[in-house]
Amino acid sequence: GLMEVYDESSVRKDYQSRLRNKMALDSKIQGAYIIADNKRTIDCQGIVRDRNVYTDYVGCGQGKLVSESATNWFFFGADESSDKVLDLGIDSYCLRIAKKMNNQPAMMIINISDSFIRSAMQSLDPGKGGYVALITDTDGKEFYSDESVKTEKALIYGTSFYKKALNGKKDSGNQMITF
């Protein structure tokens, strides 16, 4: 009854406060959310959603993939169609980490700031004409350290070089390739 509603509201406020505090202390996180249905989504902004965010997200490609495994963490690049479904005020992120909650119709979603990733990548100076890219294998999205790089399709993902690097036994290495 009324006590359960109060307890749920109290727990939601506690977790929203924790998310806000974490984000205030950690510039790497652009947004953190626990999505669920029945107005139970918890986000860093304290907004109560009047729709079933979890069900809506599971209806798109990203959400469907995450919903199929409670043991895996999934890494995605920025995705406009998923962002529209989530409608969580998502701005400038380049890496989304998503995980289904064990035995619950809920997911944790953390969006990592593009400026944080870009600054880390820029320290890996590839030299004149070179690129540094973060590639999310789950969806093939490429994020470049150089903001001016805009591509219609992937330059690296799916190429023979990419497959060789992904399946290689070495922990590190480099190779010059030309496009």
Where are these regions (language model features)?
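Juxtamembrane extracytoplasmic/periplasmic/luminal helical "stalk" adjacent to the first N-terminal
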Residues: 1-5
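Non-catalytic interaction/Regulatory regions outside core domains
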Residues: 6-12, 97-99
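Solvent-exposed, extracytoplasmic
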Residues: 14-24, 103-150
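Extracytoplasmic/periplasmic ligand-binding sensor regions of membrane-associated signaling proteins
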Residues: 23-111
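Acidic surface patches and DE-rich sequence motifs
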Residues: 36, 101, 136-137, 177-179
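Short coil/loop residues immediately preceding or within conserved phosphate-binding loops
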Residues: 91-96, 129-130, 172
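Extracellular/periplasmic juxtamembrane segments that couple receptor/chemosensory ectodomains to their
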Residues: 106, 126, 138, 148-179
